[in-house]
From Swiss-Prot:
Family: Belongs to the PIGM family.
Alphabetical keyword list: Cell wall biogenesis/degradation, Endoplasmic reticulum, Glycosyltransferase, GPI-anchor biosynthesis, Membrane, Transferase, Transmembrane, Transmembrane helix
Main subcellular location of this protein, as a coarse class: endoplasmic reticulum
Main enzyme class: transferase
Pathway given in the UniProt record: Glycolipid biosynthesis; glycosylphosphatidylinositol-anchor biosynthesis
Subcellular location: Endoplasmic reticulum membrane
UniProt name for this protein: GPI mannosyltransferase 1
Membrane association type: Multi-pass membrane protein
Tagged with keyword Cytoplasm: no
UniProt key word Cell wall biogenesis/degradation: yes
Transmembrane segments: 5-25, 79-99, 108-128, 162-182, 191-211, 238-258, 260-280, 309-329, 333-353, 365-385
PANTHER family, per the entry: GPI MANNOSYLTRANSFERASE 1, PIG-M MANNOSYLTRANSFERASE
EC id: 2.4.1.-
């Protein structure tokens, strides 16, 4: 391993150790805890499993039982933070896999700069060290893409299927991955390739789902999957649907005929279905990664529930998108500023609500939701335009070569 890679990974590890250690200090000395409230849910659910019971006895546990199994060492070692160590390890290994995936696309120095978007990102580090499990999901997705790039379709499908079992949303990648395999094969064994990844993905989904269902029955399906289709969380929610969810949770409906929040899936899934068209002009693996990035960005922006941990879903794909971007440094700085601003406006009002007890849901917090949505829609447009300009340039170069 090159010494530059070792240096980056060492710094990344030390940063995580620092954040992790500070988190333990804050938890023991301050009223406001560093550890994510969800981590205590995971921990308690693992406690039920450790006693031979269902993790769903823990109120608000809405995840696959596999996650609670991962935290069983908390009880074996009698240390509540052991699960966080696992999440940090998945976080770091994901960074290593990002470096491996970037190999061949650019020089080593650029690879490490791009990988730093994940490895040195304070948002990523904070989320994993607070005890959020998104790093496990990101690891599964990146592994699926790593083996897809190397044409190891059976292994890729297994990782991809397991990621869908872990959380539903990666299923949106099925369409662009299918289009990529279909078009990049140039009619050579394309049906067989689609079949291989399709059957292995199905195994990756159904095998763990079957075993979890055998263990916990219908409550597993209800809490792990069905709940997320109807959830109405309105706390810590950046989404433009936040106010609608709040009103509906209080029994106030803006429409007599339908709950408006149920319409949230329409623009979201429409965009996720339309964006893979960007693959038609350029069927390279690099362009597939670009499409997955903008597709995920659109999914998060238009989702009816959007919290900071959801940003991880597209941040893990961002190094591949920025590898060959045509966005200038000046415009890039503006985009980063706007992205931070969109969160800062909302967080300023959320602070007044959470810590000052002020009733700022409307219009203050709603205004923050609108600002967040509009800025992120603008950024999505910038990213899509960037991809289209790259494919147009490649198309023109191809015509010149002919």
């Amino acid at each position: 391993m090159h010494r530059k890679v070792i240096l980056l990974l060492t710094v990344s590890l030390l940063l995580r150790i620092g954040f992790f250690s500070y988190g333990i200090f804050q938890d023991s000395h301050f009223d406001v805890k560093y550890t994510d409230i969800d981590y205590f849910v995971f921990h308690d659910a693992a406690g039920y499993v450790n006693n031979g019971q269902s993790p769903y006895l823990r109120d608000t546990y809405r995840y696959t039982p596999l996650l609670s199994f991962l935290l069983l060492p908390n009880y074996y070692l009698k240390w509540i933070h052991m699960g966080k160590v696992f999440f940090v390890l998945f976080d770091l290994i994901t960074g290593v896999m990002i470096i491996k995936l970037l190999q061949g696309s650019c020089q080593l120095t650029k690879q490490l700069i791009l990988a730093s978007i994940w490895l040195l990102n304070p948002i990523v580090i904070t989320i994993s060290t607070r005890g959020n499990a998104e790093s496990v999901l990101c690891f599964l997705i990146i592994c699926a893409l790593y083996f897809l790039k190397r044409d190891r379709l059976l292994i890729s499908g297994l990782f991809y299927g397991l990621s869908i079992h872990f959380k539903i949303y990666p299923i949106i990648y099925a369409l662009p991955i299918g289009i990529y395999l279909l078009l990049s094969s140039h009619n050579r064994n394309c049906i067989w390739r689609l079949f291989m990844i399709g059957i292995s993905t199905l195994i990756g989904i159904t095998a763990p789902t079957y075993f979890m269902y055998k263990l916990y029955g219908s409550e597993f399906i209800e809490h792990s999957y069905m709940y997320h289709l109807t959830r109405t969380d309105h706390r810590h929610n950046f989404s433009i649907w936040n106010l609608v969810l709040l009103l509906e949770s209080a029994g106030i409906h803006l429409s007599q005929s339908i709950e408006l929040s149920k319409l949230a899936f329409v623009p979201q899934l429409t965009l996720c279905a339309v964006l893979p068209y960007l693959l038609w002009k350029s069927q390279t693996f690099e362009n597939l990664m670009n499409v997955l990035f903008v597709q995920t960005y659109a999914f998060v922006t238009f989702n009816k529930v959007c919290t900071s941990q959801y940003f991880i879903w597209y941040l893990v794909l961002s190094p591949f998108y920025f590898a060959n971007t045509t966005i200038t440094w000046r415009k890039g700085v503006v985009c980063i500023f706007l992205w931070i601003l969109s969160q800062a406006v909302w967080l300023s009002q959320a602070y007044l609500l959470e810590f000052k007890g002020q009733n700022v849901f409307f219009p203050n917090l709603f205004f923050g939701n609108i600002v967040f949505f509009l800025i992120n829609v603008y950024l999505l447009g910038v990213f899509i335009t960037d991809i289209k300009s790259r494919t147009s340039f490649q198309d023109n170069q191809h015509k010149k070569n002919i």
